[in-house]
Amino acid sequence: TDHAGIATQAIVEKNLAKEKIDKNIIGREKFIEKVWEWKIKSGDLILEQLKKLGCSCDWSRSRFTMDKLMSEVVTKVFVALYNKKLIYKDKKLVNWDTNLKTAISDLEVVQNEVQSQLYYIKYSIEDSDEQITIATTRPETMMGDAAIAVNPKDLRFKNLVGKFAIIPIVNRKIKIIEDHYADPEQGTGAVKITPAHDFNDYDVGKRNKLEIINILEKDGKINNNGIKGYIGLDRFEARKKIIIELKNLNILEKIDNIKNKVPYGDRSNSIIEPLLTEQWFVNAKSLSKAPIQTVKSKKTTFFPENWTKTFYQWMENIEPWCISRQIWWGHRIPAWYANDGKIFVAENLKQAEILAKKFYKNKDFKLIQETDVLDTWFSSALWPFATLGWPKKTNELKKFYPTSVLVTGFDIIFFWVARMLMMGNYLLKDTPFKKVYVHALVRDEKGQKMSKSKGNVIDPLELISEYGADPLRFTLISMASPGRDVKLSKDRVTGYRNFLTKVWSANNFLKLNNCK
């Protein structure tokens, strides 16, 4: 099982809060002790569910991603990839959870359709009576605007291209540029570009060498790049205030009520902000080449076969993989910082000090370890060989690597399957598995993803206690057809239990009557 970094930390923090204990007061080491206590008490629930369902496994071989040997492998791989320049630190736009105060993966972001407002705002043209109107759902980000983009084919704005617009209230001028990202059919056709707070805008900013102005603190409040009267306000309070000001200035043209998709953190249920922060990344583009070739050569195949196309689409358009998380529970990144910011990556402090002594020669230095931990998927990506004793050439590794079949859900093909293929092909020069069997997801009776926040979680142990393991197994197997998710409910299990009861009764009748 994996250590589920963010999810586990969130649960333990909530439990401590009930006892009025603040993790920041007890400190990192004490908090990690509390997490281990919770893990020992509750962490084997998944294994218990599998056992009750009747899975026939060698349970003596169970492994955990935070086990000592697994942790050593994680450190070795990080150092090896860093030394090959496949891991690096950079400042990029990431999904930022302002509640948990950490970067999160795309998998942990849920796009919820919500009722929103689209604000049409007039920007004055410098040294002119002309105006250009843009439409945005996030007017508070005006403080970080770097340009206004229009489509090169949109003749309505040809006379304005190259001129400067004045950001209302902010009173800073920005250039009107041409970029194909601007859609003439969307909004007004003119788009405000805020590279520090939107992934698409970030790409436009890079293409056009625009200034990147971050206006948010990590808790979602306006920072010192904001304007007077807004600094320190929560982003949503800033939005309310800026709308009032725009109305008073008579430059808010109109407001449309719309439905749009907004990113939420699946753990915190808070709105996710694209935020420019320093993080650690894996050069996934370089590592993706071998897995693509592995699938093309059919050394690894997908069933159903249609998932092969999805795999190619993901891998051929892969972005750098953000592997750092600003939490305490997980594999702490093996990097040490000197007083001047110089980074030394090593398997332990002693080795880092050797590197630092060599670099600084006779100068004094002090090393402080990176506080971030690794994305849980990083250690999970090493699972096929780390659990078999790698880097030692053990009998288990020779016998079970590559394995024959991996069974998994489609939702983690990219986050887990692809990354296992990356690491296996790079470190062992061979695919970790020959076949990938992609199964359906178990959802609630309405087809919704199960989550504690929705209150729609169905615990298999409760179903087994009420109906027995066989009816639940029969239900899941009967409904698990390729390409269709399982809509699970108690009524479904009741129906299959009743059917099995009839089969059992018929069997008993035959036995009692000595039927052959």
Q: How should these model regions be labeled?
A:
Residues 165, 266-270, 371:
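Active-site cores of enzymes that catalyze phosphoryl transfer or operate on phosphate-rich substrates
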Residues 100, 170, 268-269, 339-341:
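Short Cys/His-rich metal-coordination motifs, predominantly Zn2+-binding knuckles/fingers
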Residues 45, 241-246, 250-253, 283, ...:
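Substrate-binding cleft of carbohydrate-active enzyme catalytic domains
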Residues 1-153, 194-207, 211-226, 235, ...:
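N-terminal, positively charged nucleic-acid-binding surface of large information/translation enzymes
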Residues 14, 97-99, 108-124, 189-191, ...:
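Conserved active-site neighborhood of enzyme catalytic/cofactor-binding cores
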Residues 123-129, 166-171, 338-340:
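Short acidic, glycine-rich loop/turn motifs
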Residues 163-218:
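Extracellular/luminal Protease-associated
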Residues 157-162, 228-240, 248:
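A glycine-biased structural micro-motif
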